[in-house]
């Protein structure tokens, strides 16, 4: 997200342009990924419903998948216009075997599907050893994140002395 409403205190410690460049470098070798700069170009706060509606209008022939974490799944009803997000895409809630209770997540997904007449699904993901804040902390302490993030992003972080 280029300018998320819940992170207005520069918790990223990077600019939007830095984040965009890290993603660009990380995905350039994959034909099936494309970075959209819609949120980066916006000066105002970006809300997910606006972004998803923009994509649906710009690419009406495409079906979109919106990936969220378990924490976001349980907070989804507090988002701005959750019903509009649910109307534009399939929402995949990432399940991590080491962190989440699968049955509780499946129950919440069923509840949201009923409430919004939507398509929420469970996305079983590989267990990643570190959360993003742990990666940033490791970098701040001068540690290595080799193998934890794409090498292209790691090189950019080192070149630009980010998270220090």
Regions found by a protein language model. Give the residues of each.
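Nucleotidyltransferase catalytic core that binds NTPs
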Residues: 1-164
């Amino acid at each position: 997200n280029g300018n998320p409403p819940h992170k207005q205190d520069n918790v990223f410690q990077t600019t939007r342009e830095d984040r965009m460049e890290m993603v660009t470098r990380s995905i350039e070798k994959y034909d099936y990924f494309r970075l959209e700069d819609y949120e980066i170009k916006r000066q105002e706060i970006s809300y997910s419903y606006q972004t998803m509606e923009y994509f649906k209008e710009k690419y009406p022939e495409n079906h979109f998948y919106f990936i969220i974490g378990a924490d976001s799944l349980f907070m989804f009803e507090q988002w701005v216009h959750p019903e509009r997000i649910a109307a534009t895409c399939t929402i995949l809630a990432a399940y991590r075997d080491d962190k989440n209770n699968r049955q509780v997540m499946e129950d919440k997904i069923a509840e949201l599907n009923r409430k919004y007449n939507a398509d929420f699904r469970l996305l079983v993901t590989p267990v990643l050893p570190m959360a993003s804040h742990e990666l940033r902390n490791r970098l701040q302490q001068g540690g290595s994140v080799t193998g934890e993030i794409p090498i292209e992003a790691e090189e950019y972080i080192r070149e630009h002395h980010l998270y220090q």
